[in-house]
C-alpha cells in the first residue's frame, strides 16, 4: 500500500529537503551539532564550516573543500554584519539561498550579512557559534540575533539538563550515550537486566553517577539525595538573563551594535492563517511530538518570554524588536508566511 504524501511536501516541496537536513545532524565538539558542510542543493548551499551562502553561484569555484562565506566580496559602500539564530535565521524552508533573511537584508540595507544561523540551536549555542567564528569576522558593525523560540520551550521540553549550561536538542541522547560507554561491569549487567529482562527504560546518566558515588562514598548513595530538581520557569529566566549578558559583553568588546529580534510564530503574531498554513498546521496537529511542542509555545509563553527579553535588553543596553508585533501591525492576514 502506498504511503500518503505529506500535505506540507505537496504545498512546499522544499520542506522535504529541510526535514531530511534536520534529522541528519552533523555532530560537532563543544557546540554539539551544526549544519553539514559543502551542501549543494537547489534550495540550500553551505560552505566548509556548514554556514549558508547568501547567493550561491555554481559558476564560481565553490566546489573547493576550503570554500567559505567569509571569502565573499562586497562593495566598499557596504559594512560587515552578522545574522545569527536558529531555523528562522538559517532560512529553514526557503526555496533558495537568495530567499533567506540574510540575503534579503543584503539587498535592502547598507550591510553585507554573514549568516551564522543553525536550525535547532539554543541561545547559548548561538553564542558559542559566534565566538568560535569571531576571528573570521573582520570589521563587523552590526549583529542581529533572530531567536527566542527554542529557548522559550526547551527548559520545559528537555527533562534533564545542566542547570548552568542549559538544555539543547538531543540533550538526553547525548547524556545516555556518553554514560553507557562509561558504566562499570556491574552497571552494564544491570543495564542488560533492566533493558532486556524487565524492559524498563533507565536513565543511564543517573545510573552512571550513582555507580560512581556508590564505589567512592562511605555511605549508601541515593540519587534523590543530591539531585536538584530544576524549575523550568527559573531556568528560563536565568538563561535569558545570562545569554543577553554575554551578548552585551561581546558587543561592547567588539564595538558592534546588537539588536535582539524575537522570531515570529504563527500563533504569537495573531494573524489569520492562509489556506496553506491551515492545511499544514492541521497535519502537524496529528503528530504527538509537534502537538506537545505547540502546547509549550502558547500565547502565555509568548508574553512571558517577550517580557523577560525586553527586561534584560534594557538591563544590558541591547536594542529589541518583536517580529510578531511587526507582522501584526502590517496586517499580513491570510498571507502565507509560515511552514
What is each stretch, according to the model?
Residues 115-117, 262, 322-325:
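Residue-level recognition of beta-strand->loop/alpha-helix junctions
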Residues 88-95, 115-116, 233-237, 298, ...:
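Second-shell loop/turn segments in exported
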Residues 150-308, 328:
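Serine-dependent acyl-ester chemistry module
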Residues 308-322, 332-339:
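Histidine-centered active-site loop/cap adjacent to the catalytic His
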Residues 78-79, 110-112, 138-142, 254-259, ...:
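Loop/turn elements at helix/coil->beta-strand transitions in domains of secreted/extracellular proteins
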Residues 82, 90-186, 191-194, 198-204:
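Conserved SGNH/GDSL esterase-like catalytic core that processes O-acyl groups on lipids
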Residues 1-95, 99-107, 329-331:
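Membrane/wall-proximal cationic-aromatic binding patches
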Amino acid at each position: 500500500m502506498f504511503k500518503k504524501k505529506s500535505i506540507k511536501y505537496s504545498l512546499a516541496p522544499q520542506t522535504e529537503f529541510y526535514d531530511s537536513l534536520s534529522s541528519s545532524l552533523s555532530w560537532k565538539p563543544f557546540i554539539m551539532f551544526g549544519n553539514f558542510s559543502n551542501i549543494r542543493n537547489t534550495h540550500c548551499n553551505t560552505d566548509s564550516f556548514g554556514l549558508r551562502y547568501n547567493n550561491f553561484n555554481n559558476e564560481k569555484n565553490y566546489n573547493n573543500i576550503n570554500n567559505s562565506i567569509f571569502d565573499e566580496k562586497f562593495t566598499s559602500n557596504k559594512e560587515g554584519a552578522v545574522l545569527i539564530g536558529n531555523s528562522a535565521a538559517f532560512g529553514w524552508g526557503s526555496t533558495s539561498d537568495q530567499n533567506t533573511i540574510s540575503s534579503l537584508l543584503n539587498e535592502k540595507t547598507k550591510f553585507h550579512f554573514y549568516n551564522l544561523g543553525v536550525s535547532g540551536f539554543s541561545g547559548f549555542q548561538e553564542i558559542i557559534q559566534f565566538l568560535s567564528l569571531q576571528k573570521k569576522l573582520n570589521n563587523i558593525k552590526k549583529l542581529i540575533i533572530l531567536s527566542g523560540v527554542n529557548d522559550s520551550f526547551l527548559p520545559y521540553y528537555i527533562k534533564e539538563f545542566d542547570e548552568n549550561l542549559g538544555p539543547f536538542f538531543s540533550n538526553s541522547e547525548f547524556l545516555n550515550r556518553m554514560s553507557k560507554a562509561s558504566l562499570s561491569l556491574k552497571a552494564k549487567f544491570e543495564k542488560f537486566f533492566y533493558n532486556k529482562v524487565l524492559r524498563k527504560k533507565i536513565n543511564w546518566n543517573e545510573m552512571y553517577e550513582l555507580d560512581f558515588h556508590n564505589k567512592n562514598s562511605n555511605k549508601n548513595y541515593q540519587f534523590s539525595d543530591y539531585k536538584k530538581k530544576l524549575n523550568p520557569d527559573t531556568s528560563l529566566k536565568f538563561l535569558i538573563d545570562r545569554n543577553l549578558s554575554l551578548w552585551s559583553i561581546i558587543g561592547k568588546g567588539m564595538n558592534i551594535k546588537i539588536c535582539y529580534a524575537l522570531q515570529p510564530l504563527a500563533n504569537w503574531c495573531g494573524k489569520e492563517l492562509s489556506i496553506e498554513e491551515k492545511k499544514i498546521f492541521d497535519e502537524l496537529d496529528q503528530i504527538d511530538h509537534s502537538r506537545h511542542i505547540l502546547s509549550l509555545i502558547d500565547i502565555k509563553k509568548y508574553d512571558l518570554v517577550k517580557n523577560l527579553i525586553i527586561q534584560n535588553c534594557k538591563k544590558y543596553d541591547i536594542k529589541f524588536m518583536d517580529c510578531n508585533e511587526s507582522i501584526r501591525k502590517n496586517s499580513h492576514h491570510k498571507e502565507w508566511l509560515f511552514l
